Curated annotation (Swiss-Prot), chain A:
The keyword Nuclease is annotated on this UniProt entry: yes
UniProt EC number: 3.1.26.5
Listed name of the protein: Ribonuclease P protein component 1
Ranges where the record places region Disordered: 73-93
UniProt record similarity statement: Belongs to the eukaryotic/archaeal RNase P protein component 1 family.
Keywords: Cytoplasm, Endonuclease, Hydrolase, Nuclease, tRNA processing
One annotated Gene Ontology cellular component of this protein: cytoplasm
Swiss-Prot record, chain B:
A GO cellular-component term linked to this record: cytoplasm
Gene of this entry: rnp4
Organism lineage string: Archaea, Methanobacteriati, Methanobacteriota, Stenosarchaea group, Halobacteria
Pfam family name, one: Rpr2
Organism: Halobacterium salinarum (strain ATCC 700922 / JCM 11081 / NRC-1) (Halobacterium halobium)
Annotated TM spans: none
Residue ranges of coiled coil: none
Protein name according to UniProt: Ribonuclease P protein component 4
Keyword terms of this UniProt record: Cytoplasm, Endonuclease, Hydrolase, Metal-binding, Nuclease, tRNA processing, Zinc
Record note on cofactor: Binds 1 zinc ion per subunit.
Catalyzed reactions: Endonucleolytic cleavage of RNA, removing 5'-extranucleotides from tRNA precursor
Length: 123, 93
């Protein structure tokens, strides 16, 4: 039901999505990948395999992975009930899309991002 | 067609419950606060399940038996958060 399209992504919820730093003015940050666990006005916090990394939005280019149920937790309670060898959501190839976004477009408080580019009704 | 803000609240609700389930209470709180802020700015009503199972005072995701006590009194249910805040909900019958 919940749908994030590549067009709406900069205004949509980033928390819970999988992201990778595709390019950055600081080379040491390129390649950081993980689940977005927190967001501030100027940074995105990724939970990587080796810990938590806080990446400034400015100067970075992020590659977000969109799946049909990106909001579902990777280690949700349902995991234990999946039959052995059954399908996981990662194997359904056509439902996965990668969206590349310039970090500069995300520079906004998390709760204000949804309102960017929308004319206010109260004027 | 739900607005982006409504979809974000929906996702945050799922994320907050998932974080609370894995014991990441402070993360869950932040998700609840962000969802509340979105509802406030976009003049949306939060889902009933969200309103009932989050603490008004400390924004915790309430899990009965773990960080919330649920007791029935005459005519109302009392949900007590670990922080001490009570919430009362009437019932009939």
């Amino acid at each position: 039901m919940t749908t994030i399209t590549p067009e709406s992504l900069p205004r949509h919820e980033l928390l819970g999505l999988h992201a990778r730093v595709a390019a950055d003015t600081d080379q040491s940050r390129v390649g950081i990948a993980g689940r977005v666990v927190d967001e501030t006005m100027q940074t995105v916090v990724l939970r990587t395999a080796s810990g938590v990394a806080q990446v400034p939005k400015k100067g970075a280019t992020f590659e977000f992975r969109l799946t049909d149920e990106a909001a579902a937790p990777d280690n949700g309670v349902g995991t234990a009930f999946k039959p052995a060898g059954g399908e996981t959501r990662q194997t359904t190839g056509e439902s996965v899309a990668y969206v590349t976004v310039d970090g500069g477009r995300l520079l906004s408080r998390p709760e204000r991002r949804s309102e960017n580019g929308v004319d206010s009704k109260w004027r | 067609m739900a607005s982006i803000a409504a979809e974000r609240i929906d996702r945050l609700h799922t994320l907050a419950r998932a974080a609370a389930r894995t014991g990441d209470d402070d993360r869950a709180r932040e998700y609840v606060r962000l969802a509340r802020r979105l509802a406030e700015r976009n003049r949306l009503t939060l889902p009933p399940a969200f309103r009932r199972f989050t603490c008004d005072d400390c924004d915790a995701v309430l899990v009965p038996g773990r960080n919330a006590r649920v007791r029935t009194r005459s005519g109302h249910v009392v949900v007590t958060c670990d922080c001490g805040t009570h919430a009362r909900y009437p019932y009939t019958g």
